[in-house]
């Protein structure tokens, strides 16, 4: 677990576009177009994070909040600096 990092994410499903919005305290805010049913929104968040961080989807693991808007993802530690340096249009 030393080579992993937990990222808190606040998700807005059924949005107009898939987008990383910015930070709300310690949590990264994201919007996804998929509805929160049958894991569709979770899969969309995983895809969005993987693309933004240039990671394979298998490196983005949902560890808490499967049915909640507040989620926790396990990511490789090497992306921590990338998360905080993302250019986010608010």
Swiss-Prot record:
Signal peptide (from-to): none
A Gene Ontology term for the protein's cellular component: cytoplasm
Pfam families: DUF167
Gene3D superfamilies, alphabetized: YggU-like
InterPro entries associated with the record: DUF167, YggU-like_sf
SUPFAM superfamilies cross-referenced by the UniProt entry: YggU-like
UniProt xrefs under HAMAP family: UPF0235
Family (UniProt): Belongs to the UPF0235 family.
Name the UniProt record assigns to this protein: UPF0235 protein CPn_0497/CP_0257/CPj0497/CpB0517
The organism's taxonomic lineage, starting at the top: Bacteria, Pseudomonadati, Chlamydiota, Chlamydiia, Chlamydiales
